[in-house]
Amino acid sequence: MSDDDKRHMELARLLVSLFPGRKLNGFLVGLLHSLSGRYRLPKELRGDRVPSSSKLARFIGTLDRERHIHSYFWDLLRRERPSRVGDIDRVARLWEEEGHWKGLESLRFPAGEVFPQVARGSSDNNGAPPLSFTLSHGDPKSDPEPSSPSRLVNTGLSEAERPESPLASDQCLVTSHAYFFWLEVGAWIEGSIEDEPVSLPEDLPSGARLRVVLFSSPGGLVLQPDADQGVLCIEGDGRVVVERPACVPPALQSRELADRRLFFPLRTPQAPGTYRLRCNIHHEGLLVQSRDVVLTVAEQPQRQSEALRSRVDYALSQTLSPTHLRQLGSATLSVLLNDDDWGTHGFRFVGGDDYRSSVHLDDAMLQEMISLARGAFRRASWGSKERYEALPSRPPYRYQGAQSEARLREDLVMMARIGRQLYDRVAEQLGQGADGADALRERMRLPGHIQLALKQGARHLVPISIFYDHRLDVALKDFTLCEAFIRASVASEPLEKSPCFQGDCPHREDRDVVCPSGFWGFRHTLALPFGMAAQGERGLMDLPGVLRIRDTPALLIAVSEDPDFVLRDNHLMRLQAMSGVAPIQVARSREKALELLRQQGSHLVYFYCHGGVDAETRAPFLQVGPLTDPYIFRDTLRVYDIRWRDPAPHPLVFINGCHTTELEPEQAIELVSGFVERAGAAGVIGTEVTIFEPLAVGFASRFMDAFLRRRLSLGASVREARLGILQHDFNPLGLVYLPFALSSLHLAGEASEGTSVAGGAGALVTPPA
């Protein structure tokens, strides 16, 4: 064993003896927080179980190699365990003897203070000189504390009679009893049930507000309706305090505790079992973190490993840093689909003015909603609700050729009937029946931003773009098309500026008139950003809201050489002629595509290709280059080390793909998420159903002009492309495009602050001759 290994093992054994059980986890989490969030605690060191000394020693070796085992570390240990100073100094001397404290004058600690000298006082009884620090500005401190308080997010449970005393994570709750779920941001709290505590950054601006909202499932834990949300605020001194409590426990003896800890009253059900809470943190209406809280309820008090636990399973921002929070933008309505343990799905709605509600659908109803929506898109595209490849003959693309008002009316009526039924199924379960549906309808009348949050392991993509909320009698047979829309479509002004799409359609209350502005996907900007919590492949990368450019954005295009793509070459020529874009790189083979993907610097990666599902492995793929070239799978990204790393841009990936075996979004999600989680993309654009080449070219051209040349946000660019196709081609199928990214994602110069601006791999088939 080398001298380094011996030092690491000695320190590991010391830490195990200093911090028994979960206390070791708390110390390590606090230590990593002091290192500005650069490291994550390995899985084997999390939880209540004491890790082996060898595993802990390996982690210490990582810190040692980065020069983090220095005087500040040992001083922290002395403060934490003053009764064990002798043991601490004995191990510390192993580092001092090897000269590991040299060069401390160059260290900058998280508080932002430089320690140019290590001043030594008189020796203690153990012969080791205690350390004191002299700050660069000449203000000596014998026992320095960070200038900013810790900002770990702690959650836990306490009994209603003793709200200030956290329950241990191995303590089961008891049936039919009252408790408090609590959340506090600060130093590590004994009794916190977080699997992996997430820290708020030290530089959150004064006045920043975080809204914490709790949800439960029917038949489970009972929340108090008027005490299920609270607000935290960042004070000028950096502390995180309660601005608006959810509830102040009557038995709470410490008013000071109520000023920093949110308490949410709950009652356990009569039956023992495992129950869940959903704890959401919102900033400016946008869901930025969500926790799955799992609680074990027993008939009698008892101990059980991990009886109480909280796990972050959705996080647009791991760090909640102010810069990143500003990039995320805002949301008028945030919707999280949450699977529970009984085969049902909970929609968690959160909006402004304290709006929050839940809808619960069983699996069969949700699947039917998805099938109805995709069937409507298929009927509009090729005249049948069946999948394209399942048909005995290949029907033509219905929107080939000149625009037709009659065809558009037929398809909009068909889609509106389905969209209205889907909207009613969700809206009328919002807690107040028809009143709940009307309240949501009025809330969403004006154009806004809708976030459909895709948490880890999402299996369903809810078709909210087809939701239709104008007052429509779906039983009628004869409908007319809104004449205000017809007039606006032939005007020079873009549709998004017309009264209908600003929430003022004159036929909004008419039961026999259909207007495309009634569809959420036309009136609002929609986005489905991945929450990447606990996705180890991409480390600590926050989902970016800004793509930095120096002069012009860089575009990489990978194309299929299928000769049936008759619009491809002209499409590429038009993109290459687009002003304000750097020279475009084009890959016409798989080998070249992988080579260019490995390079750093692209802001948008565009696949104009085939795709599908492999017959043997059922894995989704993309096919570029000659038809004889091998496929690109999710694993291909790892095999070829395709990963976009800072400081290079994390590009947006646009998949305009076709396949002979239709790739449904639930299958495509594996490939789509791979570009985000494994390769580090900012997001992905895909489609709900098979698309034809004219639609692919029309949508992509409009989107890229808005996103790359005019630098609108992704959400605004997608909406503009949808409405452009609707206005100029009388084609509603722009609704099939899905943006798996932040709606606020946009291009910005390197000197820009990056504040937000305005505003599934699908299938592409060539129309039969």
Swiss-Prot record:
Keywords (A to Z) from UniProt: Antiviral defense, Hydrolase, Protease
MF terms in GO: peptidase activity
UniProt-listed Enzyme Commission number(s): 3.4.-.-
InterPro entries registered for this protein in UniProt: CHAT_dom
Top EC class for this record: hydrolase
Gene Ontology BP, a term: proteolysis
Annotated function: Probably a dedicated protease for substrate gasdermin bGSDM; cleaves the bGSDM precursor, releasing the pore-forming moiety, which integrates into the membrane and triggers cell death. Involved in defense against bacteriophages. Expression of gasdermin bGSDM and this neighboring protease is toxic in E.coli.
Protein name: Probable protease Ga0334635_1659
Organism: Vitiosangium sp. (strain GDMCC 1.1324)
